[in-house]
Amino acid sequence: MTKNNNDLSNSSSNPPSNRPVAGKEAELEIQRETHAAQSGQSESWLSRPIPTVKRNSLPQLTAVETEPSTECPQCHSMITNTALIFNAYVCPHCDHHLAMTARERLTGFLDHIEAELGQEFSASDPLKFVDSKPYPQRMEQMQTKTGETEALIVLQGKLRDMDVVACAFDFRFMGGSMGSVVGDRFVQAAEVALTNKAPLICFAASGGARMQEGVLSLMQMARTSAAIERLRLAGIPYIVVLTNPVYGGVTASLAMLGDIHIAEPKAMIGFAGKRVIEQTVRETLEEPFQRAEYLLEHGVIDQVVHRHQMNDTVYRLLAKLTHV
């Protein structure tokens, strides 16, 4: 009877197993089976497939095409190019006058275009000038970049009902610098104006004489000045519109020999730049001394006119000068 009780107690204390075990071997077997069971459970849990999350089907968004824009250098607002063209390149937020190409300026100024003058002239390279690249190569790059053959464009046409000759510098073309072709075109513009007794209007924007042509460039200052004098003697009006910027040999010649000088707001006008003058005289100069408004206050120019009023202002002045 005792033996049976011992058998029952031993059977109840032993773990369930397929084979009989006893003593320390039983404890080790229990630990191994428990560890195996836990390892098997963990592996099976990790190997379970991750359920997919149900998502609402949304339409695929594509990139929205935006119109090219330009940042205003004054107020840093972004303006679409269409809005700039419609507003004559004047910022609608701060009224800053942005740069225009010569052709855009003239086509917006004239009501009717009859002919373009000076296309037969082409630049030569008599000095075989080389800076960072040969002069002919630089000219080719500028022509490709701007779509123009030179820094001055001359158009003959009408402003309202008045026959005029108008020319404009393109600052993109080597800084609007004046070389022999620019001089040739301006002289031809003056001669056509003289022949047709039509007023001459010049929109100036230049860094000065073109260094790549040396003394030939400087000679254009004398040629253009002589052509303007012939207009004056014949009583033909010559109006200069000073845009931003006008410097150097252009300021010292054709840009300051007009019967009337008009400037756009905040245009920079001078012979040498502020830094060069300060280094020469060794003095700190007043900041706005080359601004159009400062020059107007000191009697250097006659008017500062907003770009939107430029056409009407020039026409009224010409009507008075020609007694129309």
Swiss-Prot record:
Which keywords does this chain's UniProt record carry? ATP-binding, Cytoplasm, Fatty acid biosynthesis, Fatty acid metabolism, Lipid biosynthesis, Lipid metabolism, Metal-binding, Nucleotide-binding, Transferase, Zinc, Zinc-finger
Biological or metabolic pathway of the protein? Lipid metabolism; malonyl-CoA biosynthesis; malonyl-CoA from acetyl-CoA: step 1/1
Q: Which cofactor does it need?
A: Zn(2+)
* InterPro entries, per database record: AcCoA_carboxyl_beta, Acetyl_CoA_COase_Trfase_b_su, ClpP/crotonase-like_dom_sf, COA_CT_N
Segments of skewed composition (Low complexity): 1-16
Reaction(s) catalysed by this chain's protein = N(6)-carboxybiotinyl-L-lysyl-[protein] + acetyl-CoA = N(6)-biotinyl-L-lysyl-[protein] + malonyl-CoA
Where on this chain are zinc fingers (C4-type) annotated?
72-94
Q: Which residues form the signal peptide?
A: none
Composition skew (Polar residues), residue ranges: 36-45
List all Basic and acidic residues biased stretches.
Answer: 22-35
Q: Which GO terms describe its cellular component?
A: acetate CoA-transferase complex
User: Per the database record, which ranges form the CoA carboxyltransferase N-terminal domain?
Assistant: 68-324
Tell me how the cofactor is bound. Answer: Binds 1 zinc ion per subunit.
Please tell me whether the keyword Glycosyltransferase is annotated for this protein.
Answer: no
One example of the protein's molecular function in GO is: zinc ion binding
Q: Which GO terms describe its biological process?
A: fatty acid biosynthetic process; malonyl-CoA biosynthetic process
Localization: Cytoplasm
Q: How does it assemble?
A: Acetyl-CoA carboxylase is a heterohexamer composed of biotin carboxyl carrier protein (AccB), biotin carboxylase (AccC) and two subunits each of ACCase subunit alpha (AccA) and ACCase subunit beta (AccD).
Q: What does this protein do?
A: Component of the acetyl coenzyme A carboxylase (ACC) complex. Biotin carboxylase (BC) catalyzes the carboxylation of biotin on its carrier protein (BCCP) and then the CO(2) group is transferred by the transcarboxylase to acetyl-CoA to form malonyl-CoA.
The record's HAMAP family line, in alphabetical order, gives:
AcetylCoA_CT_beta (MF_01395)
UniProt lists the family membership as follows: Belongs to the AccD/PCCB family.
What is the protein name stated in its UniProt record?
Answer: Acetyl-coenzyme A carboxylase carboxyl transferase subunit beta
Native source organism of the sequence: Psychrobacter sp. (strain PRwf-1)
Query: What does UniProt list as this organism's lineage?
Result: Bacteria, Pseudomonadati, Pseudomonadota, Gammaproteobacteria, Moraxellales
* Gene name of the encoded protein: accD
